[in-house]
C-alpha cells in the first residue's frame, strides 16, 4: 500500500518572537496551546505563507486593524516579521520517501505601505540528519547566530553533494513542483485555483461552514469534464470550419464570374497603366536623349552666334567709334562752315560799324567843344548867382536880426553876437587869428585884391587850355590806335611800337594773300589721306575676317585663290542636297517598315503568350506546329488513364469513410440502433462498459467476446423478454447479457487463453476459438487507434483523389487551351520575332539620323566657308583699286606741312582783317607820337586849382566885408543913439537888400536860360556819346567774337568749308549705313541668340525636368519593379502587346477598367479604399498595391484548403475543377461530424450518473462523523428541473426542434442555448450570448445542484447552515466538508499525477476551544481514518490525549521579546516527555 506523504516540521526564522524555531508536526494532530498573543496565529500564518506565498490572497484578519477593508496596506503579515531576512520552511516526506524542503524567504520592504517581499524556493536531496535551522543560520558564538541571505543559502547548498536548490520566479512553478512531489493535492494552474485552495485553508483555519465554499461546491467537488467540452469545441470548430469552407465555396461559386471580371479588369487597369508608364519611361528617356542632343546642338549654335556676335559687335564698335569721330568731324566741319558764314557776317557788321563810328567821332568832337563853352559860361553864371544868393541871405539875416533887436530888449546883445560870429567866421576863412574889427577893413582890401588877381590868372589859363587841347586830341587818337593793335603799353614806347606794327602789317598782308592757294592744296591732300585711311581700314577688316595678316603684294593672289574656293564649294553644296535626299528616302523606308512590324508585333506577342502559357502548363517546349498537334494527341491518352485511376481511388475512399463512420458511433456501437435499444431496455452496451480497456488488452477482450462484443448488458433478462416480441428495428444478431453495469466482470465465460488466441467454452458442447484480431476495435483506445489509421489512409486517399481529379480537369482544360491555340495563333506563333527586326531597324534608323546630323553639320560648315569666301572676294574688290594709296607713306607728312603753312596764312589773314583799318588810320598820324603833350594835364590841374583859389578868395572877401559891416555892433552908444543909428542902418539894409534881390533875380534868370541851353547841349553830347559808346562796344564785341571764332573770313572760305562738310557727310552717311546694317544684323543675331538662349533655357529646363522626371520615375519605377517582382505579378502586368498602343489608348483602357472596378469593389471597403488611393497618377506603385490587394483578396476568398495555388488566375482555373468535388466531400464530412442531440443528452446523463456515484462514495466516508447533536453529514446532488427537461427533449423530442440543429447559421452550442430559451422563456438570460449559454449547457456541472445536509437530533436531515448549528457543530461540519473536498481533489488529480504518490493532507483549526471533548475526539478519529494531519490552535485548557501539543508562552527578556515553547506528545497513557528536536526555551540571538 502506498504511504501518504506527511509534513515533518515547520521552521520559522526571524519571525516576531521566533528567531530560529522548528516545530515537529505530528502525523495526526498538532496542537498549539497558549494564551492570547502567545504566537499561535503567527505560527499558522508562517505555515500558510509557505504553502501559498501569494500576497494578493494572504490576509490574516485577526491581527489587522479594526474595521480593515480589502484595501488595507497591511494584510497582517508585515507585523509578524522582524527586520532583516526571514524564512518560513516546510520539511516534508512524500510517498516515495523523498525529503523535500519548501519554503519562502520574506523581508520587510521599507516604506509606509508595509509591504513584504516573498521569494519561494525548494530543496531536494537533503540528508535526514540536516536540520532546517542549520541551513539558514550561521553560528557566530555560543549565544549569537546570523541569518543567511537567499544567495548565501544557495551557495551553501551548492557545496553539498546531491542537494538541489530551486528558486522560483512564479507561484505557479512553485505549486507545480509541490503538486508533482505530492505536497499539495491539486495542481494549481491559475490564480483562480490558488484562490480556491486559499479559501479552503482559510475556511479550515477560522472554522465553521464557509459560505464561499458551500456556494460553489460544484467547483470544488465536481471535476471539470474538459475532455468532453474539448470534444464539443473541436467538433464545433470543425463544423464551423466546414461550414465556413462550404460557405466560401458557395460564395466562390457565386463570385466566380466576379473573380474573373475583377481579375480581368484589374489586370487591364493596372497592366495598361503599368505598360503606359513603361512606354512613357522609354519615351521620356528618348525625349531626354533628344533634349540632350538638341541641347548640345543649340549650345554649339549659340557659341557660333556668340562668336559672330562678338565679331559684329567689335566691327559695330569700330563703326560706332568711327561714326563718333566722323560725327565730330562733320559737326566740326558744319560748325566751321557756320563760323565762316558767321565771320563773314561779322566782318560786314564790323565794317559798317567802323564807318558809323568815324562819323560819330567827328560829330562828338564838335559837340564837345560846344558843351565846353556852354559849361564855362554856366560856371560863371552859377558863381554870380551864388554870390547874389549869399548876399541876399546875409542881408535878410541882418535885417531880421536887427528887426528882432528892435522889438526885444536884447536886440543889442543879438547884434553883438552876430558880429562876433561874423568875426570868428572871417578868422577861420582868412586864416587870421589876430583879426579885429578895427583891422577888418584893412584886410578886406587885401583880400579883395587877391580875388582880383585870382580872377585874372584864371582867365589866362583858359586861353592856354583852348590852345593845348587840339594837340592833345591828335596824340591820344594815335596812341589809342597803337594800344588797340598792340595792347597796353607805355606812352614813351608808342612811337617805336607804331613803326613796328606798320612794318609787320605789310608782311601779314603778303601772307594773307596765300591762304586760298594753300587751302585748295590742303583740301586735295586731305581727300587722298582719307581715301588712304579708308583703304587701310578695309584691309584691317579683311585681315580680321580672314584671321590672318596679309601684305599688299599678296592680295591679288589671295583674290584668285578665293575665287577658286568659291567654285569648288559651290559644287560641294549642290552635291550635298542629293546625298541628303538619298538618306532621307532610306529613313522613310525604314520608318514604314518599322510601322508595319509594330502593327504585326501585338498579334505575334499574343500568340507567343498563348504558346508560353501552354509550355508552362505542360512543361514542354514547342518549336513547330507539328509538335503542338502531336502533344494534343498525348493529352487525350493521358486524360483517359487519369479518369480510370481517379474512379478507383474514389471507391476506396468511400469504403474508408464508411468504416470510420461505423467506428465513430458513441459507445463503440457499430450499429446506431444498438444505442436506442440499450436505452430502451435500460441497459448498457458491452462495448461501453469496456470502453476504457487499454490498447494492449483490446485484442484479448475482442477475441473473448467475439460476435457478442456488441451485446447489451441488462440488469434482468426476464424484464425485457416481453419487449423482444415484435422487435424488428435491430441487427440480425442481437446479444443480451445479464449483469450489473456498475460492477460487470468477464466471469460469464469459461476461457482458455492460447498464443494470440482464446478458446471460449460457451456450453458443454459448444466452444468458440477466436484469434486476437490484428486490428482490434474493442474499446475506445482500439477504436481511436483504428480511426486514426483510417483517417491517415483517408487523408492520403483524399489527397490522391483530389490530385487525380485536378489532373483530369487540368488535362481537359489544357486540351481546350491547345484547341484554342491551334484555332487562333498557330499560323503566326512560329514566325520570326518582329521585335528583334524592329530593334535592328531602329539601330539602322539611329545610324541614319546620326549620318544626317553629320551631313547637315558638314553642309552648314561648307555654306559658312562659301559665305566667308564670297565676303572676302567682295572686300578684295574694294581694296585692289586703292593699292597705290596704301603704298604712299609720305602723304600724311605733306598734309601736316601744308596745314602748318595754311595756319600761318590764316593767322595773318585774321590779323589783317582785324587790324587793317587801325593800321591805315595810324599811318598818317604816326608822326604825332614822336612828342607826348603831357603839359596838357598839368595845365588842366592848374586851371582847376586857379578856379578853387578864386572861389576861396571870394568867400574870404565876403566874410571880411561882413565883419566890416558889423563893426558898429561891437560897441554901442546909448539907447537913443542906438535907435537912431539902428534906424539908419535898417534903412540902408533895406536898400541893399532890394538891390541884392534884384541882382539875384537877374542872375537866376541868366543861370536858368543858360542851364537850359547847357542841358540841351549836354543831351546832344550824351546822345552822341551813348551812340558812340554803344557802337564802339558793339564793334569791340564783334571784333572779340570774330577773334573768338578764330576764322579768317575770305571769299573762298565758305566754299571750302561747305565742300569739307559735304565730304564728311557722305562718309558719315556711308558709315551710318554700314552701322545700320551691322545693327540690324546684330539685332537679328541678338534675337537669334536670345531665341537660342530661351530655347537653350527651355531645353535645359525641359532636359532637367525630363531628367528629373526620368530619375524620379526611375526611383518610382524601381519601387514598382521591386514590388512587382516581390509579389510575382510581373508576368501578369508586363503585357508586351500593350507596348504598341498609344498613351491615350492605354489611358482609355485603364479608365474603362477603372469604371468597371469601381462597380465591382463597391461593396468591399478595403478594395474600394485601395482603388481610390491607386487613382493618384503620381503614385503608380499604388496601382500595383491595388493589384496585389486584389490578388490577396482573391487568395483569401479562394482559401488554400480548397485550391492549392497562390495565383488567383490559376486558382480560377482550378476553381471549377475543385468546387464540385469539395462541395460533395464537405457536405458528407459535415454529416459525419455533426453529433445528434440524443448523443449529447446520453453523454451528459452518463457523466452525471458517474459523478453522482462518486459523491455517493464520498458520503459513505462521512456517515460515521458526528459533532454534538449532528449524527451524520452528507452531500445531496440533484439534477435541476429545467435542465432535466432539456435532457428529455434532447433525447425524445429532438425532431420537433430540428430547425435549430439543422441550421447552418447556428453552431450546436447556439442551437442548444436557443432550445433552452425556448423551453424556459421565464428565465432571464441577461447580456450573455447564445454561444456562452450553450457552452455552459454542455458542462454537466451546470445541470447539478449540491447542498450539504446534516442529521441533527430529532430534526432529521436538514440543510447545513451556520444559523441552525452550534459553533462546535458548524466547525465539525465545515471540517467534514473540507475533508471531502480534499479527497475529491485527490481523486481528480490521480489521473494527472503518478500512481505511486499519495499527497499530503493537512488542515488547520484556530480557536479549537469552541469544540467539546467529544467533537475533538471525533476530529482525531477522522484524521486517523483519513490519514490527515491537523494543526489546532487552542487556549491552555485544551489537553488532547493524542497527537503532539506545544505550549507557547511569550516573554520579554532584556527588552527582547521571545516565545517560550514546550512540546508534549500523547500524555494520557504515559508521562509527558519532551519531544526530540525541541528546546525548552527559544533563546533569542542577535544578528551580527
UniProtKB/Swiss-Prot annotation:
Upper taxonomic lineage: Bacteria, Pseudomonadati, Pseudomonadota, Gammaproteobacteria, Enterobacterales
User: Into which family does the record put it?
Assistant: Belongs to the SMC family. MukB subfamily.
| UniProt keyword list | ATP-binding, Cell cycle, Cell division, Chromosome partition, Coiled coil, Cytoplasm, DNA condensation, DNA-binding, Nucleotide-binding
Record keyword Lipid biosynthesis present: no
Q: Where is this region: Disordered?
A: 1049-1074
Report the SUPFAM superfamilies cross-referenced here. Answer: P-loop containing nucleoside triphosphate hydrolases
Compartments reported by the entry: Cytoplasm, Nucleoid
Domain of life, per lineage: Bacteria
Query: What organism is recorded for this protein?
Result: Salmonella newport (strain SL254)
Instruction: Share the domain note from the entry.
Output: The hinge domain, which separates the large intramolecular coiled coil regions, allows the homodimerization, forming a V-shaped homodimer.
The name this protein carries in UniProt is: Chromosome partition protein MukB
Note down the stretches annotated as region Flexible hinge.
666-783
Coiled-coil residue windows:
326-418, 444-472, 509-602, 835-923, 977-1116, 1209-1265
Q: Name one GO cellular component term.
A: nucleoid
Summary of the function given for this chain in its UniProt record: Plays a central role in chromosome condensation, segregation and cell cycle progression. Functions as a homodimer, which is essential for chromosome partition. Involved in negative DNA supercoiling in vivo, and by this means organize and compact chromosomes. May achieve or facilitate chromosome segregation by condensation DNA from both sides of a centrally located replisome during cell division.
Q: Where is the composition biased (Basic and acidic residues)?
A: 1051-1065
Q: How does it assemble?
A: Homodimerization via its hinge domain. Binds to DNA via its C-terminal region. Interacts, and probably forms a ternary complex, with MukE and MukF via its C-terminal region. The complex formation is stimulated by calcium or magnesium. Interacts with tubulin-related protein FtsZ.
User: Keyword ATP-binding, does the record have it?
Assistant: yes
* Ligand binding (ATP): 34-41
Instruction: Kindly list the GO molecular function terms attached to this UniProt entry.
Output: ATP binding; DNA binding
Q: Could you tell me the Gene Ontology terms of the biological process aspect for this record? A: cell division; chromosome condensation; chromosome segregation; DNA replication
Q: What is its main location?
A: cytoplasm
